[in-house]
Amino acid sequence: MRRAMRVERKTEVRNGIKRGVFALFAIVVELIWVYIGLRNLTGEYSWIPFLIQGLAFVLVLGIYGRHINAAMKMPWILLIAGAPFLGVPLYLLMGFNGSTQRMRRRYEIIDEHLFPAMPQQGGILEELESVDYGIANQFRYLSDRLGYPVYRDTDICFYPTAEEAFEAQLEALKKAERFIFMEYHAIEEKTAFERLFEVLSERAAAGVEVRLFYDDIGSIWFIDHDFIRRMEEAGIEARVFNPMTPIFNAFLNHRDHRKITVIDGKVGFTGGYNLAEEYFNITHPYGHWFDTGIRLTGEAVRSLTGIFLENWNAIRGEKKDAEKLEEYLRLPSYCAAEPGYCQPYADSPLDGEQVGENVYMNLVNHAKRYVYFMTPYLIITDEMSQAFCLAAKRGVDVRIITPGIPDKKMVYQATRSYYNVLTRAGVRIYEYTPGFMHAKQCVADDELAACGTINLDFRSLYHHFENGVLFYRYRAIAKMKECFLGTFPQCREVTEQYLYGRTLFQRAEHCLLRLISPML
């Protein structure tokens, strides 16, 4: 078994740290100011406590009656009932925030142009229904409910390491002729990005349109405020998603966790890795970093292009750009080597649909022989937990690989708090002992798989912008299964001895963490 590598500390960009710390400090001060202000007003106006208590009662009833997951309700109900002077204003600020409503409207405007520009080709779903009606229903959910087409003429290549995926990505980028679109949660201006920047700047100089889109909080510690200017000087148009501000804004909770590269609308990459050192094991802050990726070639890349353009345009709210989507969304002429079915999809916290969770639950619920998952976090709803347990109880071989070395200790303990109920039902859980498991993928019954950015945790499933690819009957699925089978021997399987060995303090800690898990 491979030894865990020496833990190394990341190098952080100083001004990014200052900006992040200042913004967080300012937001905390604002919330404290609201709390103290309400408290002070109670001394002048005796009716204010009754108003707050009345609002607390109404809000608790309203939250309880909302058609959302029960785990999302409980923390708010306890906070509002237990500390109404804090919980009531905080919930009102979060729930009735104008910025979130404005962003939701922007996405609706973009989608009015986006989805008509990439319609479902006729006959594909009907053909899939004749092959396997149950499988077709899983694809039909994403197609009929959300508008993401199913494609045939697409080849898929699976990369069992982020290093292999990145090298293939660099080679493909060097061949770009029309445009390059890249969207990532985290960028670090070090060795890996320098290699990428060299290719991007060279293609930009050759007349290729290059766009780079990144999440501000995901990258805030690793790039400085001059990053966009430097990109523009090299001919690269860069935009930042949802910048961190010192003013309280509920939309700040929603981050862009997507990882997409599109080249000329013909080749696309996605997977778990960002553009930072640890993802390619250049540094080792958490032992060996395990990540994977996939390459799409052919028609399905159109949907990856559309997913990128949705965020790119919505963040600026530029309607004129939305009307030009068609020129980037033409189907490429491509004849695939494999007769599989491929469906890229995205998840948004603004549409009220838990797409990532529903795709995973469909995979688990329809598995007949086995279903395997890799995820860095395992913080799930009761519904997802029950799906895993029921599958195991009906004889499906359910296995989940989680990290052996955590990147966030509290989240790691929250992950472990779910082990007991799952393993008792027959789910087999493995911890990747050499380091941090960051891959987000699933394979079932040798024929169906999903790979992308979506973790098995509340933040990915409910709060972030995510993307993935669902695919059926590809050789890449066998490669993905080999990846699982090669990883299990490197893991420590969670056993009953481990579960019953928990101390009373650990049990209490796990109960508390499960209660607040929707906020982690």
Predicted feature locations:
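N-terminal localization/anchoring segments of enzymes in phospholipid and broader phosphate metabolism
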Residues: 1-358, 362, 366, 406, ...
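Helical hairpin unit composed of two closely spaced alpha helices linked by a short loop
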Residues: 367, 377-398, 403, 408
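Thr-Gly-centered strand-to-loop micro-motif
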Residues: 374-375, 402, 432, 451-452
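Short, solvent-exposed amphipathic alpha-helical segments in soluble enzyme
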Residues: 387-391, 417, 485-486
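CN hydrolase (nitrilase-like) catalytic-core segments centered on the catalytic cysteine
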Residues: 414, 426
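Catalytic-core elements of nucleic-acid end-processing and repair enzymes
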Residues: 440
